[in-house]
């Protein structure tokens, strides 16, 4: 038996709430639920995009090792991050729930490596991010107070 996380987008929820919901589940095994016939077309598009992306990475997820770039979070934390190390790919989920609009995530597992980073989900929503190779850190800025993004980090070379 394999555990999973329920994904339940609510009808009437905004785009960021739907994205937040989907990011909660993408790095694990998704049990998709909810009244999908009642959500908006925009929400359906976001759910579809998340599930399509999940299908491309689920093989890597099974073999990946989890780590928490800013430590394990508590309920009252403004920021949370969970990463999966799948060798040449790292998947980094970042959640903002208030506080400052930017955070820097130490990514020490990637020290000394040349990487390519993209916002994998959602691809067409605003987010500012950058890689600091000298510090092996990922900086993320999200303007919405409640939001989440999923980044894909590809190790291009094991040496800079």
Question: Which positions does each model-derived feature cover?
Answer:
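Active-site-proximal substrate-binding groove within the catalytic cores of carbohydrate-active enzymes
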Residues: 1-127, 139-142, 148-152
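Non-catalytic accessory/interaction domains
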Residues: 124, 136, 158-159
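Extracellular/luminal ectodomains and secreted, surface-exposed scaffolds of diverse proteins
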Residues: 127-133
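Mature N-terminal, pre-catalytic/accessory segment of carbohydrate-active enzymes
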Residues: 143, 155-160
């Amino acid at each position: 038996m394999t555990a999973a996380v329920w994904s339940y987008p609510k009808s009437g929820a905004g785009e960021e709430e739907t994205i937040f919901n989907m990011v909660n589940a993408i790095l694990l095994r998704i049990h998709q639920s909810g009244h999908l016939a009642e959500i908006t077309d925009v929400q359906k598009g976001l759910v579809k995009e998340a599930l399509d992306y999940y299908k491309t990475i689920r093989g890597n997820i099974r073999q990946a090792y989890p780590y928490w770039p800013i430590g394990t979070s508590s309920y009252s934390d403004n920021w949370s991050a969970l990463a999966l190390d799948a060798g040449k790919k790292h998947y980094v989920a970042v959640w903002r729930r208030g506080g400052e609009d930017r955070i820097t995530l130490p990514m020490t597992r990637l020290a000394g490596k040349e990487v390519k980073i993209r916002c994998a989900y959602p691809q067409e929503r605003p987010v500012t991010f950058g890689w600091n190779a000298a510090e092996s850190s990922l900086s993320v800025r999200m303007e919405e107070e409640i939001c989440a993004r999923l980044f894909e980090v590809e190790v291009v070379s094991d040496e800079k």
